[in-house]
């Protein structure tokens, strides 16, 4: 599937959130939007623009293109409960996201690469589809030939235990993780308002 090839740092500054560790460091120095008038006073933002920005935040943060993102929304609508909560819970189950949450990669782009290159197993079977939906109880581990890669070991060593969410159990020594449960919305600490996304799509 095609991926965004532009400057993630510029997108991060425009949206006001750090999408990668590199963007986070850059935004500490230049926290305003890119462009000549980035530091100037901004005009009033329309309701549509606010809704669109929140959608862009979610798409770029999780690395999802429009068609697939809209499909997640449709599935969220069809489920019981609050549509926005359902949307977040669905996306959090993505394989590349779970690999990132477990600390196996410093970014979702890095975790997506690990998955796409076939380095990982789910319950003993190779899965190389980033959008694969992980289920509670699934065991995620590296293939024997892919174990102890320096990039993974480095990422794990730099991931504090406090950053690993409660719904994922990680064995750093053996580079394994178990997806314990689908998180509740309140457990997912990300800087977006999914309700505005729901309002945008429901028009």
From Swiss-Prot:
Residues 93-153 form the S4 RNA-binding domain. Belongs to the universal ribosomal protein uS4 family. This is Small ribosomal subunit protein uS4. It comes from Chlorobium phaeovibrioides (strain DSM 265 / 1930). The gene is rpsD. One of its GO terms (biological process) is translation. Pfam families: Ribosomal_S4, S4. GO terms for cellular component: small ribosomal subunit. Part of the 30S ribosomal subunit. Contacts protein S5. The interaction surface between S4 and S5 is involved in control of translational fidelity. One of the primary rRNA binding proteins, it binds directly to 16S rRNA where it nucleates assembly of the body of the 30S subunit. One of its GO terms (molecular function) is rRNA binding. The keyword Manganese does not apply. Keywords: Ribonucleoprotein, Ribosomal protein, RNA-binding, rRNA-binding. CDD domains: S4.
């Amino acid at each position: 599937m095609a991926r965004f090839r532009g400057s993630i740092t510029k997108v991060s500054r425009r949206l006001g959130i750090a999408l990668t560790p590199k963007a986070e460091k850059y935004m500490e120095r230049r926290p305003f939007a890119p462009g000549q008038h980035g530091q100037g006073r901004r005009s009033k933002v329309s309701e549509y623009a606010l809704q669109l920005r929140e959608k862009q935040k979610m798409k770029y943060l999780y690395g999802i293109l429009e068609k697939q993102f809209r499909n997640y929304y449709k599935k969220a609508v069809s489920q019981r409960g609050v549509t926005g909560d359902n949307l977040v819970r669905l996306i959090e189950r993505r394989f590349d996201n779970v690999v990132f949450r477990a600390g196996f990669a410093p970014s979702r782009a890095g975790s997506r690469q690990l998955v796409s290159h076939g380095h990982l197993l789910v319950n003993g079977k190779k899965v190389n589809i980033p959008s694969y939906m992980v289920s509670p109880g699934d065991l995620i581990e590296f293939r024997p030939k892919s174990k102890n890669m320096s990039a993974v070991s480095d990422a794990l060593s730099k991931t504090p235990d406090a950053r690993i969410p409660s719904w994922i159990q990680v064995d750093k020594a053996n580079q394994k993780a178990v997806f314990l449960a689908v998180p509740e919305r309140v457990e997912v600490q990300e800087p977006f308002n999914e309700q505005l996304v729901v309002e945008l799509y429901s028009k």
